[in-house]
Structure formats: structure tokens, C-alpha cells
């Protein structure tokens, strides 16, 4: 289940807002310019599915976003717990950074944790299957796929180069809890 926790940026262990309600999550994220919505697949997708199978399952939604936002590149990332490069991949996204284009991800399977630093607040967004998140360009954030990552996501880009992060060099991401999927422990 999707979850949003909001913290003051100086209290990484004490959220002042927690919700698993879709409407509340969407409303809170809308306040900082983030789009959060749910999609439904026309067929089941699991890690290991081809990019073509994944995109075919969501073709209508993909085409709608391309037409609305002018995305030039769409790809699929699929990572399972046995991926030999999982630690390297996790580390790449785990530091605070921003992009010069919107970061748009749709979770086809599995889960991951996007954390957004906006003003003096930190928004921890657990994205799960069927969640679409769109983080505006220039927004400070990081992503944690967890120590045993399991997700398939469709990624949308306006730039042909794909994912390009601009890192801030701050340690804020290190001060906040690491992602442990909800089913893996009783409390986050």
C-alpha cells in the first residue's frame, strides 16, 4: 500500500504526518507540485517481463502521458533481489539530487521509496504497484530501492540522454531512514 510520511528536515525519525489514504497522499503532494496517481494494468506483469510486454500492458496511459507532456524516451527498469549490481544501483540514486527534467515513474510491480526535500520539509513517498509519481524538474530528492530491491517501473524522459542526476553534495539523505518495504518489518 502506498504511504506518505512528512518530516521537518531536522527530525528524521519523527514524522508529523502519516497517511496511506490515496486522496490524502495526492492532496499533500499536489501542494509541492508532485503528481501522484494510480493506474491499472490490462495484464499482469512481473520482474523478468520484457520491456515490450510491460509497455503493451499500459499502452493507453503511456500514450496519454507522451501526448500531454512531450516525452521523447520511455523505457523500463526491472530490478530483482538477486541483481548482481543492486548495491551499486541503490547507491547511485541514494544521494540528494535533482534533474533538469521531470522525473516520472510508474511502478508496474514491487515498490520503492522516493524522498523529496522541499523547503524545510522531507516527504517520504512509498510507491507500490500501480503508482505513478511525477517529480518536477529542479526538485531535490533521492530514491531508495531497498537492500533487496524488487520493482519494475516505466520511466519517462523529455531528454534523449535519459537519467541525468545533478547531486547537491549534502548529507540530508544519510540522516533519514533507509527503505525497508512494509512487509519486511513491523515498523518503518
Curated annotation (Swiss-Prot):
Binds 1 Fe(2+) cation per monomer. Binds 1 nickel ion per monomer. One of its GO terms (biological process) is L-methionine salvage from methylthioadenosine. It catalyses: 1,2-dihydroxy-5-(methylsulfanyl)pent-1-en-3-one + O2 = 3-(methylsulfanyl)propanoate + CO + formate + 2 H(+); 1,2-dihydroxy-5-(methylsulfanyl)pent-1-en-3-one + O2 = 4-methylsulfanyl-2-oxobutanoate + formate + 2 H(+). Fe(2+) binds at residues 97, 99, 103, 141. Keywords: Amino-acid biosynthesis, Dioxygenase, Iron, Metal-binding, Methionine biosynthesis, Nickel, Oxidoreductase. Ni(2+) binds at residues 97, 99, 103, 141. Its EC number is 1.13.11.54, 1.13.11.53. The record marks 96 as: May play a role in metal incorporation in vivo. GO terms for molecular function: acireductone dioxygenase (Ni2+-requiring) activity; acireductone dioxygenase [iron(II)-requiring] activity; iron ion binding; nickel cation binding. Disulfide bonds: none annotated. The record marks 102 as: May play a role in transmitting local conformational changes. The keyword Iron applies. It holds the Pfam family ARD. The record marks 105 as: Important to generate the dianion. Its cofactor is Fe(2+); Ni(2+). Belongs to the acireductone dioxygenase (ARD) family. Monomer. Catalyzes 2 different reactions between oxygen and the acireductone 1,2-dihydroxy-3-keto-5-methylthiopentene (DHK-MTPene) depending upon the metal bound in the active site. Fe-containing acireductone dioxygenase (Fe-ARD) produces formate and 2-keto-4-methylthiobutyrate (KMTB), the alpha-ketoacid precursor of methionine in the methionine recycle pathway. Ni-containing acireductone dioxygenase (Ni-ARD) produces methylthiopropionate, carbon monoxide and formate, and does not lie on the methionine recycle pathway. PANTHER family: ACIREDUCTONE DIOXYGENASE (PTHR23418:SF0). This is Acireductone dioxygenase. It comes from Xylella fastidiosa (strain M12).
